[in-house]
Amino acid sequence: MTERECRLALSQARRLVIKVGTSTLTHKTGKLNLGRMERLVRELVDQVNAGRQVVLVTSGAVGAGMGRLGLKEKPRTLPEKQAAAAVGQGLLMHMYEKFFSDYGLLVAQVLLTRADLADRSRYLNSRHTLAALLRLGVVPIVNENDTVAVEEIRVGDNDTLSALVAGLVDADILFLLTDTGGLFTANPVTSDDAVLLPCVTEITPEIEALAGGAGSTWSTGGMATKIQAARLATSFGIPVVIASGLQAGQIEAVLKGEEIGTIFLPREHRAHTRKRWLAYAPAVQGQIQVDAGAARAICKNGKSLLPGGVIAVDGDFDQGAIVSIVDPAGKEIARGMANYPAAAISRIKGRKTGEIGEILGYKDYDEIVHRDNLIVLG
């Protein structure tokens, strides 16, 4: 699909996930920018009134809490961050509920951590709950549960969370609204030569190098985390648009097919929900390194991983474990469920499928990781 075809197809999008960052929602003081919040709500209400379903992933709890608590700098300790999040989350939801109710819409607070999505049963429950809210005409407002999460209070987590939520609800598009108008060839704030990239067909190392550093004083993200979120969402088959959260009408313009922001084109085929869950899985239990041919077969041709393509195994994992598949350079290209334990894979790596039984004394599968239990990330 070309950029133009993809942009025109967005007019048919019916389920939207919109992520808005701290730098868009707050003043430089850290206090909530109520004018921007109200404008954003009006734009989302317009989309609901047009027959679309909207999920809002919002940052800003820590920043809002800092503003209310009078903190001038980011908290340095985890308890301080969580205290700021606890104060700020209440402020955020109070204002969202007020603004949406002015237009007759109900909102629901949904606080998630990766652990909620890593467990298969909790993942399905989250999926069903969000689907029920959308059927009832409620706008789910999602944030990370910063008050109790430990690992999740880190740079860019809500960018990643928005991509995971987009996969969770089977969104038609993910919007990442930020304080820049998209991905540029240089920092548009400091460089007059910066040029907006209207379309990214593949996230290459060169694209990643354009990301620059972290975000503003109050935010925890930056362009790098947005690119990683785009990588994840597009691997699900969901297009991603990075656009300005400071300018009015960006969402509507994108949905009309206008060339606004930077669009990341999705993979042609949408990943099955089971495959998507693999991306939510807890920390992988091992790593399998493959040769260039196997990497190409997995990424380009959608093939299973066979023993002949394996060059190294790291970790002591059992059959059924979630493993990371990396290319010869060590870059993760896929994630999947291993059909054999690590010790067995080490013995059959580089060998032909027909030799598995002779080497191991048994042969349960032809593949190390079957394509039905594998999601391509790179």
Swiss-Prot record:
Give the pathway listed in the UniProt entry for this protein: Amino-acid biosynthesis; L-proline biosynthesis; L-glutamate 5-semialdehyde from L-glutamate: step 1/2
The record's annotation in SMART domains points to: PUA
Which spans are transmembrane here?
none
Tell me where it mainly resides. cytoplasm
Name the GO cellular-component terms: cytosol
EC numbers listed for it are 2.7.2.11
Q: Which residue stretches, if any, does this entry annotate as coiled coil?
A: none
Return the CDD domains for the record: AAK_G5K_ProB, PUA_G5K
Tell me which UniProt keywords the record has, alphabetically. Amino-acid biosynthesis, ATP-binding, Cytoplasm, Kinase, Nucleotide-binding, Proline biosynthesis, Transferase
Q: Where in the cell is it found?
A: Cytoplasm
| Domain annotation PUA: ranges | 285-363
Where along this sequence does the record place binding of ATP? K19, T178, D179, T220, G221, G222, M223, A224, T225, K226
InterPro entries from the entry?
Answer: AceGlu_kinase-like_sf (IPR036393), Asp/Glu/Uridylate_kinase (IPR001048), G5K_ProB (IPR041739), Glu/AcGlu_kinase (IPR001057), Glu_5kinase (IPR011529), Glu_5kinase/COase_Synthase (IPR005715), Glutamate_5-kinase_CS (IPR019797), PUA (IPR002478)
Pfam families in the cross-refs: AA_kinase, PUA
A GO BP term here is:
L-proline biosynthetic process
Which catalytic reaction applies to this protein?
L-glutamate + ATP = L-glutamyl 5-phosphate + ADP
Q: Which GO terms describe its molecular function?
A: ATP binding; glutamate 5-kinase activity; RNA binding
- Name the residues that bind substrate: S59, D146, N158
| Family in the record | Belongs to the glutamate 5-kinase family.
Q: Which NCBIfam families match?
A: proB (TIGR01027)
Which PANTHER family would you find in this protein's record?
GLUTAMATE 5-KINASE, ISOPENTENYL PHOSPHATE KINASE
Functionally, this protein is described as follows: Catalyzes the transfer of a phosphate group to glutamate to form L-glutamate 5-phosphate.
What is the name of the protein in this document? Glutamate 5-kinase
Q: Which organism is it from?
A: Moorella thermoacetica (strain ATCC 39073 / JCM 9320)
Question: What's the name of its gene?
Answer: proB
